[in-house]
């Protein structure tokens, strides 16, 4: 008998979901829906103010389990808004229609509409969405895969006095936070409380400070960054949080820090890395890095 219930921390549901994604990657490989790193960000990144609600996680994740308590899949709302995701075990795709109906019944009344994200290789899921009246405006994002084992050692040039450091070598959280929040908050409004909220994402089991990289000026200003989230057991990484200070763009800094991340990941035994781009500029950069595979994502709305 298959049962479903709300997320419950007391039942170690995060650990169940994290292991589920690790195991699914070993089967799906480049056709994954979520990687472990995204789940870690959902659970530990406290920048989203909605997460202060004690019921946030139970209201935004719902699990399907078999009689032995094995996780068969889950529905998850990443940010507590109208966008949701459905993840089934590779041999349990037949559960997708029921899980979709659950999401529509419980979450559609909360918002003006619903939106989910699926990739081009989810053929059965795409058919189910269309049957339920979901439509798509087109491509939303592209995930690129990179074979680190065949990647030549190459360091993009940096301006004089600039260097790349990780968060073991440079622990200036204030300078790093200024870069993360550029465009969202005035520098003088940055407080220790806000820095602490940003720092919670580093509690993810996929986080390793060795792969949290920044380009730093001679004056110690963090001007470009990326983070490689890793699963050493699967020899895989996801690179996220690629940012460059607006006044330092067009200097090749994002390319330099990502290429350095590739090399450090490769040296540690990581064989494959993924980066997802949602807009033209980032996608052009990520294509320049020499991907070995592509996967297109679509938003389906109702």
Language-model-detected regions and their locations in the chain:
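Conserved acetyl-CoA-binding loop-helix of GNAT-fold acetyltransferases
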Residues: 92-105, 241-244, 250-267, 287-288
């Amino acid at each position: 008998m298959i049962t479903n219930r709300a997320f419950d921390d007391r039942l170690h549901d995060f650990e169940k979901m994290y292991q589920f994604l690790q195991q699914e990657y070993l089967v799906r490989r480049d056709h994954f829906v979520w990687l472990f790193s995204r789940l870690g960000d959902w659970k530990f990144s406290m920048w989203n103010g909605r997460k202060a609600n004690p019921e946030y996680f139970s209201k935004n994740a719902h699990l399907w389990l078999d009689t032995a308590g094995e996780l068969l899949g889950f529905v998850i709302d990443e940010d507590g808004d109208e966008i949701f995701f459905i993840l089934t075990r590779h041999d349990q795709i037949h559960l997708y229609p029921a899980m979709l109906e659950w999401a529509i019944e419980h979450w559609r009344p909360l918002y003006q509409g619903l939106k989910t994200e699926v990739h081009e290789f989810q053929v059965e899921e795409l058919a189910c969405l269309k049957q339920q009246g979901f439509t798509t405006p087109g491509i939303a994002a592209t995930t690129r895969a990179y074979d680190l084992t065949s990647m030549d050692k190459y360091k993009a040039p940096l301006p004089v006095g600039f260097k790349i450091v990780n968060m073991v070598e440079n622990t200036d959280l204030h300078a790093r936070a200024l870069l993360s929040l550029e465009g969202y908050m005035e520098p003088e409004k940055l407080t220790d409380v806000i820095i602490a909220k940003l720092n919670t994402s580093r509690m993810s089991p996929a986080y390793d400070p060795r792969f949290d990289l920044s380009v730093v000026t001679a004056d110690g200003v963090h001007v470009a960054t990326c983070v490689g989230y890793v699963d050493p057991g699967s020899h895989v990484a996801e690179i996220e949080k690629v940012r460059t200070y607006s006044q330092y763009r067009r200097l090749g800094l994002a390319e330099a820090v990502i290429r350095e991340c590739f090399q450090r990941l490769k040296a540690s035994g990581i064989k494959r890395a993924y980066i997802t781009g949602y807009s033209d500029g980032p996608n052009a950069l990520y294509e320049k890095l020499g991907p070995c595979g592509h996967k297109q994502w679509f938003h389906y709305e109702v």
